[in-house]
Amino acid sequence: GHQLVNAALGGHNMLNFPRKHAVEHSEGIQHEIVAEEGSILNRLYGPKLLVNSFHRDCADAVGPDVKVTARSLDGIIEAIEHKTLPVFSVQFHPERMRGDAPNPAFGPDGTELFKYFVDLC
């Protein structure tokens, strides 16, 4: 989803990015990301948060009306927001960050991001 939104907004994606960043699908893989001040993620969760990793592809350039709002510590784009439209996307899977089976209990509750999305609609 994240890569599709990025491409639709004029961005470019890297498929099968370098192995040092790629993570096999498995339970409990996590990493820290840094959310930009004023971003949706920063307002909901603060400047740093733990998220899951279930990806081999990533956004590597965003369109002209899009801003990068979070990155992993190794520089992977983890969140984007359109500058004027109510459109945002994240690399991770917030639906798997609820602390209920089979979702591992770490980091913030991803439900808050869904609530934000529903309120935005």
Spans of features found by a protein language model:
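Short polar/charged helix/loop
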Residues: 5-7, 14-15, 31
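Catalytic nucleophile loop
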Residues: 1-10, 93
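A generic secondary-structure signal for well-formed alpha-helical elements
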Residues: 9-12, 121
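Amide-donor transfer/coupling interface in amidating biosynthetic enzymes
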Residues: 17-121
